[in-house]
A protein has these predicted regions:
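Membrane-interface alpha helices of multi-pass inner-membrane proteins
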Residues: 188-206, 212-217, 245, 338-346
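Hydrophobic/aromatic-rich transmembrane helices and adjacent perimembrane loops
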Residues: 210, 342-378
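Short periplasmic/luminal acceptor-recognition loop of GT-C membrane glycosyltransferases, typified by
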Residues: 85, 213, 217, 301, ...
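Transmembrane-helix motifs of polytopic, lipid-linked glycan transferases
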Residues: 112-134, 147, 172
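Hydrophobic, aromatic-rich transmembrane alpha-helices
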Residues: 18-28, 123, 295-327, 335-339, ...
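Perimembrane helix-loop-helix junctions
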Residues: 211-245, 314-320, 365
Length: 554
């Protein structure tokens, strides 16, 4: 299998050479548009390959969603077997697709799916810009996000994140909106699929809803204007039908599987608690701090700053001539997408850089609007980005002889098996469930075992909040339902967020602790993780393990 060391010099030089060709091709109009797009997507895939073959966790969310996918392949009923908290079911079902085709669910397969979403989003945005601003503007503007996404090595933009699918769906709705913006005859077929894609977004990630609403409102306005002109209401009706189709089918499935109460309690009410983060007045400062956490996104934003300012000036500048609908609707929609993207990135109050995925494409849309009459000058933006990445790589090469942040030699292109997972495999077999108390979801991925509780971490069962008892009750109910072969108490130095064994370990929660001690035997403690094995599994496998309170630690 393909591997990369820390300094694949020739590979990197080829990447920069291809990037230069892409930038030149963006202004060389004689090159066919399809050939230009092939070059751009080829560059993105080429430079993303080191991160894809690096088969290790880059972000805890990756392991969380991959664990969900492993579980859904075994028990495909979301909200019964899996609860992704703010992450919707579609994000997790997407990761099951490689398994259906015979591939392992791991970090490599997850990043391939993320890359496909990224490619799709780019193509949709290019098509929308081409429709709204013309091909010459679209080609020049398109190179900026391509260069950014191809050369960034910041983990939050290369790992599979819960924003990639909703952003893909969002850009699909933007492209469909562009198809009806200036049309004398609005296609009901297009409005149906626009509504369908928008209706799916709340079930990919709840934070994407504000941006979905912006596009739907724009489409509603166009359909209403069309109705006023023609008295034809089919596009409007089909938009509404499309928007209701996926939620209606989902609710039928929810009722068929008797999980409506779980949906209400844990997807609606549970996430309402999570949404109580930043207030409106705190959002600007929160967003500023978030952007500063990502040097690459900061440079991306600065490179687009002047075109964005031009776009704002053009939007609010008084016009002496009568504007077409597109002259009003397009910039208004894009500005609202920017504002809702900022809101979605900050409302939770958490400074997670991958939330900035909601802002990448609205940024470039407003920049493209700003330079549509002087598009060739915009070549400065991708050049600034390319020089930024080249400068960083040159400094890194000089200081550490390193170009690649995702070294995959020495077995790093294969799924790891940590000492904890090696120990638990003595007591498990394919098809078993396992449970991790605390937050260390990578153990599920390494063991390739389904999670025995709907949440694969216990953060919402541990921390104080109004629904803590409900989460604890479901946790215990899930343990009784799935009867996991092993339980890990991972609260400790290697756990995310929950590290205090004295107050957060499993023994601090009597109902759960009583069940564990009644049905499980403490086998060992490895890397500050306590391993419990189901008693009947010990007997079945004829393994003699005495209950111990203090055991070896590796």
């Amino acid at each position: 299998m393909l591997t990369f060391d820390n300094s694949p010099t020739v590979y990197w030089l080829l990447g920069y050479l291809l990037a230069g060709i892409v930038i030149l091709a963006s202004v060389y109009q004689k090159l066919p548009g399809k050939a230009f797009l092939v070059l751009c997507i080829g560059l993105l895939a080429f430079m993303r390959m080191p991160a894809i073959v690096f088969n290790r966790e880059l972000n805890a969310d990756e392991s969380q969603m991959l664990s969900h996918a492993i579980t859904l392949y075994q028990d495909p009923v979301y909200w019964r077997s899996v609860d992704g908290t703010t992450i919707g079911p579609l994000d997790n079902y997407l990761l099951v697709i490689p398994k259906i085709f015979g591939f392992q669910i791991d970090y490599t397969s997850g990043r391939v799916m993320g890359l496909l979403c990224c490619i799709g989003a780019l193509l949709f945005v290019f098509s929308a810009m081409k429709k709204w601003f013309g091909e010459s503007t679209a080609r020049v503007a398109f190179t900026a996000p391509v260069i950014f996404l191809a050369f960034t090595q910041e983990n939050d933009f290369v790992h599979y994140s819960s924003e990639q699918l909703p952003v893909f769906l969002l850009t699909a709705t933007i492209w469909l909106l562009s198809r009806i913006t200036d049309s004398k005859q609005i296609s009901s077929f297009i409005t149906f699929f626009l509504g369908l894609a928008a209706g799916m977004m709340p079930f990919a990630k709840l934070q994407s809803v504000p941006q979905a609403m912006v596009v739907v409102l724009a489409a509603l306005w166009l359909c209403y204007q069309f109705y006023n002109r023609t008295r034809e209401n089919k596009p409007l009706i089909f938009l509404l039908i499309g928007g209701l189709t996926f939620p209606a089918l989902l609710f039928l499935w929810i009722f068929a599987n008797n999980i409506f109460q779980d949906f209400v309690d844990f997807y609606i009410l549970g996430n309402a608690i999570y949404a109580g983060g930043s207030s409106f007045t705190e959002i600007p400062s929160q967003f500023y701090k978030l952007v500063l956490l990502s040097y690459d996104f900061s440079v991306y934003s600065l490179a687009l700053l002047i075109p964005i300012i031009f776009g704002l000036i053009q939007t609010f500048r008084p016009s002496t001539t009568t504007r077409k609908a597109a002259d009003f609707l397009v910039p208004t929609t894009v500005i609202l997408l920017i504002l809702t993207g900022i809101y979605s990135s900050t409302k939770s109050g958490n400074s997670f850089i991958h939330y900035l995925n909601f802002c990448i494409y609205p940024w470039i849309l407003l920049a493209a609007y700003g330079i549509k009459s002087r598009s060739k000058w915009f070549i400065a933006a991708p050049l600034i980005l390319l020089f930024w990445f080249a400068g960083n790589d040159a400094l890194s090469y000089r200081r550490e002889h390193r170009l690649n942040a995702f070294e995959s030699v020495n077995g790093l292109n294969k799924l790891d098996r940590s000492p904890v997972v090696v120990a638990l495999t003595e007591f498990t077999k394919p098809g078993d469930y396992m449970v991790v108390w605390g937050w260390q979801c990578k153990y599920y991925v390494e063991a390739q075992l389904a999670q025995g509780t709907a949440e694969n971490h216990s953060e919402r069962s541990i921390f104080k909040h109004p629904m803590q008892e409900k989460y604890l009750g479901r946790y215990l109910s899930d343990l009784k339902r799935t009867k996991p072969a092993v339980i890990l108490d991972a609260v400790g130095i290697y756990s995310l967020w929950v590290q205090d064994k004295k107050t957060q370990g499993i023994d601090n929660f009597p109902a759960v602790a009583d069940y564990v001690h009644q049905h499980y035997t403490l086998v060992s403690t490895i890397d500050d993780v306590t391993l419990y094995v189901r008693k009947d599994r010990l007997i079945t496998q004829q393994v003699t393990v005495l209950p111990i309170l203090a055991t070896t630690s590796h």
